[in-house]
């Protein structure tokens, strides 16, 4: 049946038009859809990028708050309010904050971004070795100009600034290079520290290099590792006086453990060298290669050790000491005093290994250095960085940084910062001394265009206006402020008396400090100094040439115009009024005055101008009275007025002299032609200067009129495809057929005449059918377009229509190329959107780490000193409650009583925290984090009693089970029958990621953290099972057997005590939900292991 229908349709003469119109319509729909999707996706990507840059700014400011708290430059009492203000700040377009200065600011930021060498020289000139001022300067540049090194291009620009700045200051220091790096007070070392601590690739490298070693040290537990033998002896004798004979054995154990840890760290650092960020590698290499040839022999040795210090002493050792700060381990892991002490000892030994070639190590280090097996790895690592062949990524970075190759790295689309940041930046630049350097001079000159201090032009919020409104009484304002400030206070108002003092402290962080804006950045807008000077010189030459052409332009000679007998008496009182009426009643504009004429008129003044008008009119009247022939037309009179050098203007009075004059706009309020002329090109000015006489008379001399080339005819049968008629018709048909959503059904066929019809006739009948349908639907606009198409087709002969149809078919391929181009652009936008999402996750991770560090610091302050009774003598209620908990917890024997006691304490501390004035401003995530920190802080001190309620019995039980599991672990495989692991899951065995997660179970101190560890382990297994089976989620039959195998292989140190601890203190968190499901599977696996042993 389908073949019959196709055979019938193939005989239809209109089929070609139907198919062509359908294809054009389909292409139009597809193109419109792609264009709409493209525009929508572009807007989404643009909005998401602004949100990303805003979030990066917030994260940077949170880091700044953390540094100020650590340096005691910021009161902890206002930290929550400040963080809340930062979190709620949204970016607006720059012009809404800085007004008309946004273009100058854009120019300044673009120059700073693209000239890192100039920025380095600028910073070097203002360096005063003051940590506070240097950190403030670096902070502004870091997040305002370089967007927190978010994009690869931003990271490279910061690397160039750091590298050039270090080269300037290290070369100046000579043999004191390492001293500068150790002090960390100069702006170069502060910038380097900022760079390595905050860029994401550095954190990735440190995680790879240090995570395993740090976790090993944490799992060591409460065992002190001391380099100093005297300190180690004192610790041992204090705890084991009766076993003094075993002191040598204890000291040997300490030394062996320290040596093993150091060797492990050095091995992992060396293995992680390929993950070292290319920009950091390039900085070290470029500094060494650039300065090695220009310094003396002593300084060259100093330089090599300085480069080693930049990696070991200034990056690796600080990360070992503070692993949570660099994201090496999670903040969920409690790093106590003993663990921190042990990490410091390890870092000191590694630093001494790197220095031993330059300095003789102290006596207490020699014992460790002689036993370490991997001391050579640091020298080999530095040789790889400084001497050996560059890695491809580092070589590309070097070429781009040195200007040899153009950068193809992704970059940002906007600058994001606050008005306060801009003011700090202006102050920094203006403090720089004057210089002869062209690039620095340009930066200073652009900065001078900005005011010394910029104030935001944004209107105040509705809430602020409401507060200032006199219509609201004072009592109502106070009531609303109290309600707003004490939204979490509840029934306790013990801290109301401090409200005024707290608000006074917070004035330092007013709203104007966080007027956040975004300013569009385009690399195409940047011109280097040489290019800018060239363009400026070229523009000056064009201006001088234009002035010269104006001076050399000939003035047309006046010609006599005969005037007929009918004279107009210009000497009468109505002469001026008549002339004004004549001048206003025509639409022809006078010829613009030359510069000489303008100068003459300007010198005459107002009175002189009026006297000149009257004198010239009187002269013209006298000439007419003496017998000059007069014309009945007005053009001749205007010609006389033009030749006389003045065109009569309306009188200065407010009374109009003609009806048309009432409709003329006021000159003072209208656009100034002389101002607009400044922005017009020379060519447009020339085109707008026709002679006034030519416009009036309609004649012009042959010498003044340019000779025009004859235009090609609109339709040409000889050049059919190239004529304008063909191109216009083709375009119109594509447009009209693309807008038609229906096609006519022509059911009548005249067989007698059908053979005589050609394509032109058939096309006309087809369009007639479309036109009738269009008119019936009252689509008058489309109907008009169809008539126009029919009119255009009538121009062509039958062969021309054939060619036209062929070109319509060829246009289909061109439209396909356009659609493919749109699809490629959409794919590019999708990749960029995915990159933005990845960068957002990175920013949120860094912010979460910063938030955890900040909340931990604030919680320690809250528990140790108390916020609400800061100025009173004695312990706060929080500290008293915690100390009471420590004293009474050890006397409780039943685990249920202990769990209830801990729950009551946490509830009390949460209530006290909610009643605190300052913590009313904390976000929900901060409150949740605060309670987690409080629980860790409290349980850490009583962990041994809570974890081992039966003391030695629990220890013995865990030790016995672990030994038995260890024997099974050596022989167990996934194919053992007692495991009953499905065969299709064997491909992912032995599930090392799950084993690694479960092996950290003992390092957590709270029930929730231990439960999270089990959940992560089960999640890993679930994801791996999903890879090997078609099921998206693993069932219990898949999960439990694999979990049994993982537990046996991981073999936690205190498995049974961990299960007991979570069951006791986790509470309702293991009663329902996803965590409860995983916990039930874990308990089942543990019970099964106990039965098979």
Curated annotation (Swiss-Prot):
Key words of the record: Cytoplasmic vesicle, Endocytosis, GTPase activation, Guanine-nucleotide releasing factor, Membrane
Record site feature (Arginine finger), residues: 182
Domain Ras-GAP: from-to ranges: 156-389
GO cellular component: clathrin-coated endocytic vesicle; cytosol; early endosome; endocytic vesicle; plasma membrane
Phenotype when changing residue 1079 to R: In b1015; shows endocytic defects
CDD domains for this protein: RasGAP_RAP6 (cd05129)
InterPro entries membership: RasGAP_dom, Rho_GTPase_activation_prot, VPS9, Vps9-like, VPS9_dom_sf
GO biological process, one term: regulation of protein transport
Pfam family, one: VPS9
Domain VPS9: start-end pairs: 955-1093
SUPFAM superfamilies documented for this protein: GTPase activation domain, GAP (SSF48350), VPS9 domain (SSF109993)
Location of the region described as Disordered in the Swiss-Prot/TrEMBL record: 547-610, 643-669
Record carries keyword DNA repair: no
Bilayer topology annotation: Peripheral membrane protein
Biological role: Acts both as a GTPase-activating protein (GAP) and a guanine nucleotide exchange factor (GEF), and participates in endocytosis. Acts by regulating the activation of rab-5 by exchanging bound GDP for free GTP at clathrin coated pits.
Similarity remark: Belongs to the GAPVD1 family.
Protein name: Receptor-mediated endocytosis protein 6
Protein source organism: Caenorhabditis elegans
